[in-house]
């Protein structure tokens, strides 16, 4: 059975990776900001909708760690998170754990250019990428709590909640 990657799978009663409120470093200030971001993400994605041009089968973990590059050929691996979600969510998954990196705007433009080479995007698709980045980041905050024993989660734990709050503040502005 394929996973679902939507607001319910991150914020609902049975989230895929646990409750973001249980992530390391989530204090009262972080919780307040992220609860406001959660509300806005839910509202914006409800308005965005799940039409066939926006929602379907996605990889959901298209990070650099899951690309094999051989000369001019690139292959995508690791389909365990593959499931149903918004197509634009794949960009957010692609920048997992590096959402605050200064190269993200350039990566975003390159990804959009590549996407447009295959199929058209409307303005709303591009605008809502920020909602998908916030959705994914909050899912990852939950993941750092539910996967606390992994090296990646341990390396992210000291700063991830505060960084997520910074992203949320920018998203809410």
Where are the regions a protein language model picked out?
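A cross-family kinase active-site recognition segment
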Residues: 1-32, 53-55
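Phosphate/dinucleotide-binding and metal-coordinating scaffold of catalytic cores
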Residues: 11-22, 84, 103, 128-130, ...
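ATP/Mg2+ or Mg2+-diphosphate-binding catalytic cores
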Residues: 21-25, 29, 140-173
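Hydrophobic packing residues in well-ordered alpha-helices of helical domains and bundles
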Residues: 34, 38, 108, 157-164
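Active-site acidic catalytic loop and adjacent metal/ATP-binding pocket
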Residues: 42-89
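Active-site activation/catalytic loop segments of kinase-like enzymes and analogous catalytic loops
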Residues: 87-120, 136-152
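All-alpha amphipathic helical-bundle segments outside canonical DNA-binding/catalytic cores
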Residues: 121-133
């Amino acid at each position: 059975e394929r996973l679902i990657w939507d607001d319910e799978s991150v914020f609902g009663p049975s989230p895929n990776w646990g409750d973001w409120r249980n992530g390391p470093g989530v204090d009262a200030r972080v919780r307040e900001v992220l609860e406001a971001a959660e509300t806005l993400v839910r509202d914006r994605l409800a308005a965005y909708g799940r039409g066939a041009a926006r929602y379907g089968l996605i990889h959901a973990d298209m990070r650099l760690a899951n690309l094999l590059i051989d000369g001019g050929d690139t292959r995508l691996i690791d389909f365990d998170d593959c499931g149903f979600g918004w197509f634009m969510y794949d960009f957010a998954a692609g920048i997992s754990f590096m959402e605050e990196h200064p190269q993200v705007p350039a990566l975003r433009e390159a990804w959009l250019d590549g996407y447009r080479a295959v199929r058209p995007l409307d303005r709303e698709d591009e605008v809502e990428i920020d909602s998908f980045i916030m959705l994914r980041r909050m899912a990852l905050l939950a993941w750092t709590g539910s996967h606390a024993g992994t090296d990646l989660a341990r390396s992210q734990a000291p700063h991830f909640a505060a960084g997520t709050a910074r992203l949320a503040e920018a998203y809410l502005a």
